[in-house]
Design a protein with these regions (language model features):
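C-terminal beta-sandwich/jelly-roll accessory domains of carbohydrate-active enzymes
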Residues: 197-244
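Glycine-rich, flexible loop/turn motifs
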Residues: 7, 20, 58
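Short, surface-exposed linear patches
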Residues: 53-57, 72-73, 225-226
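Alpha-helical solenoid scaffolds that mediate protein-protein interactions
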Residues: 1-2, 112
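C-terminal capping/lid segments that line or modulate ligand- or cofactor-binding pockets
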Residues: 10-49, 53, 78-193, 198-203
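Generic long, charged, amphipathic alpha-helical segments
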Residues: 58-85
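Active-site-adjacent bridging/hinge elements
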Residues: 4-9, 61-71, 130-133
Length: 244
C-alpha cells in the first residue's frame, strides 16, 4: 500500500520525505522479483504496463523508465534513466516465474541474445528501440563489454529455455523449439541432461531417461525427474504432450 498507486496500477518510488514520485519506472518488476506483490496487482502491472509497447514492451523490452514518461532519457551512459538494463533482464526471470507469466520469458531471452549478438557485447544496458549495445569506455581504457549480469542472464535464459535449472529441491526443464541442442547440469555426483531435437526433447537423470516432451514446454520435476507440473512457454504448446 505504501508504494502501490491503485489509480495507475503500479508501484512508485517515494523521496526521503515520503512524497510519491510520479515517474513510471520498472520497479514494480523488482517487487515481483521479491514476490512481495499480491497476485492481482502483479497481473495488473503486467497487463497494463509491462506488456504495453508504448511503455515497457518496446522492440528491446524492459526500459528502466517507461518510454512515454516525460522523464525517460535514452542516454548511453549507465544511470537507469531509460535504457534497458541487463540486470533487469536477469531479475525478470524470477519475477515473471513468481506470478506464472512463463510465456513472456522466451521473448525476453531471445531479445537479449539478439542484442548481445555474435560480437558478444555483454554491456550494462541496451537501446530500447534498436537493441544497440552502447559500448562505453573512459579515455585510454578498453570498452566495457564484460558486464557480469549480462553474462549471467544469457546463461540463465539458456538454461530455462533449452536446458535444466536446479531450483531449490526441484528441477526446471525447458523444451523450447527452434534449435537442436544438448544441455547438461552436473551437481556433485548427479547429472541432469535434456536433448532437444528442435521440435521436442528427451530428459535424463543420471543417464536414465525420465520423460519426453513436446516443444515449448516448461516442466518442473523433483530431483529424481518425477513430474510435478507442466506449463507453456508458447501459445500453441500442449502441456499434455509429455510421455514417461
Amino acid at each position: 500500500d505504501y508504494l502501490w498507486d491503485d489509480a495507475r496500477g503500479a508501484c512508485f518510488d517515494r523521496d526521503k520525505n515520503h512524497r510519491p514520485q510520479s515517474v513510471l519506472t520498472h520497479n514494480t518488476l523488482r517487487c515481483m522479483y521479491w514476490n512481495s506483490l499480491p497476485a492481482p496487482l502483479a497481473a495488473r502491472f503486467v497487463k497494463e504496463h509491462l506488456c504495453n509497447p508504448a511503455e515497457f514492451w518496446t522492440p528491446m523490452p524492459l526500459p528502466s523508465v517507461a518510454v512515454n514518461d516525460p522523464l525517460f532519457r535514452n542516454v548511453t551512459t549507465n544511470n537507469w534513466s531509460g535504457q534497458a538494463e541487463a540486470l533487469t533482464y536477469q531479475r525478470a526471470i524470477r519475477a515473471l516465474e513468481n506470478y506464472g507469466f512463463y510465456m513472456l520469458i522466451p521473448t525476453l531471452g531471445r531479445k537479449l541474445m539478439q542484442a548481445i549478438g555474435p560480437e558478444c557485447r555483454f554491456v550494462q544496458q541496451y537501446d530500447p528501440f534498436t537493441g544497440t549495445p552502447p559500448v562505453i569506455c573512459e579515455p585510454g581504457q578498453p570498452p566495457q563489454d564484460a558486464y557480469g549480469p549480462a553474462m549471467l542472464s544469457v546463461l540463465e535464459y539458456t538454461a530455462r529455455l533449452y536446458g535444466v535449472s536446479p531450483v531449490r529441491d526441484t528441477l526446471v526443464w525447458g523444451s523450447c523449439s527452434g534449435a537442436a541442442c544438448r544441455y547438461t547440469q552436473t551437481v556433485n555426483d548427479h547429472s541432469w541432461e535434456i536433448v532437444n531435437s528442435g521440435h521436442g526433447a528427451e530428459a535424463f537423470v543420471d543417464g536414465r531417461k525420465v520423460f519426453t516432451a513436446g516443444p515449448d514446454l516448461r516442466i518442473t520435476t523433483d530431483l529424481q525427474g518425477h513430474i510435478l507440473r507442466a506449463d507453456r512457454y508458447g501459445q500453441d504448446a500442449d502441456v499434455h504432450d509429455i510421455k514417461l
